[in-house]
């Protein structure tokens, strides 16, 4: 039996859309990558976790920024048997006020992202993790749009590893 590549699985899940979109970065684009919909599939989540672990196993816990990064972090956590961490985008008005859910102080944390464009979400996650005492050196993105995230993260001494590049989804 031939195993589908992650690229093929994302295309089959209709994770790539064409039209007029405003991205989380604020940029306008004619292409939208809908990883959040794609990762509702257990098969795609398992494939992503397996792919992440072919690139990195040297971490104590895996983190994701809410909302898109959380199911990715959970899937990598289950596949690696290592804890996961949730990074909230904003503080709640009740309960515990921390943006970080999980133990990160002094730990090597792998940050997983659904899609990287400018790198803004990853930078936010890295800053939150580092301010809580974590060591962060790597970000793995399911899809990188090649629109500056790599360069932005490099400025923070972070290596960005995309599992798929947007042009590979479009051009094959």
Curated annotation (Swiss-Prot):
Its EC number is 2.4.2.10. Coiled coil: none annotated. Pathway: Pyrimidine metabolism; UMP biosynthesis via de novo pathway; UMP from orotate: step 1/2. 5-phospho-alpha-D-ribose 1-diphosphate binds at residues 88-89, 92, 94, 113-121. One of its GO terms (molecular function) is orotate phosphoribosyltransferase activity. One of its GO terms (biological process) is 'de novo' UMP biosynthetic process. InterPro entries: OPRT (IPR023031), Or_phspho_trans_dom (IPR004467), PRibTrfase_dom (IPR000836), PRTase-like (IPR029057). Keywords: Glycosyltransferase, Magnesium, Pyrimidine biosynthesis, Transferase. Orotate binds at residues 117, 145. Its cofactor is Mg(2+). It catalyses: orotidine 5'-phosphate + diphosphate = orotate + 5-phospho-alpha-D-ribose 1-diphosphate. The keyword Glycosyltransferase applies. The keyword Magnesium applies. Belongs to the purine/pyrimidine phosphoribosyltransferase family. PyrE subfamily. Catalyzes the transfer of a ribosyl phosphate group from 5-phosphoribose 1-diphosphate to orotate, leading to the formation of orotidine monophosphate (OMP). Homodimer. This is Orotate phosphoribosyltransferase. It comes from Methanospirillum hungatei JF-1 (strain ATCC 27890 / DSM 864 / NBRC 100397 / JF-1). The lineage of its organism: Archaea, Methanobacteriati, Methanobacteriota, Stenosarchaea group, Methanomicrobia. The gene is pyrE.
């Amino acid at each position: 039996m031939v195993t589908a590549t992650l690229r093929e699985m994302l295309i089959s899940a209709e994770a790539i859309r064409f039209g007029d979109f405003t991205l989380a970065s604020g940029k306008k684009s004619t292409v939208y990558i809908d990883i959040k919909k794609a990762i509702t599939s257990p098969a795609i989540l398992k494939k992503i976790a397996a792919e992440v672990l072919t690139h990195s196993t040297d971490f104590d816990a895996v983190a994701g920024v809410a909302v898109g990064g959380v199911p990715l972090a959970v899937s990598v956590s289950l596949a690696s048997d290592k804890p996961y961490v949730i990074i909230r985008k904003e503080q709640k008005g009740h309960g515990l006020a921390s943006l970080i859910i999980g133990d990160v102080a002094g730990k090597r944390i792998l940050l997983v992202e659904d899609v990287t464009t400018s790198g803004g979400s990853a930078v936010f996650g890295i800053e939150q993790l580092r301010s809580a005492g974590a060591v962060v050196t790597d970000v793995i993105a399911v899809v990188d749009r090649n629109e500056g995230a790599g360069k932005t993260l490099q400025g923070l001494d972070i290596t960005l590893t995309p599992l798929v590049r947007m042009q590979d989804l479009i051009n094959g």
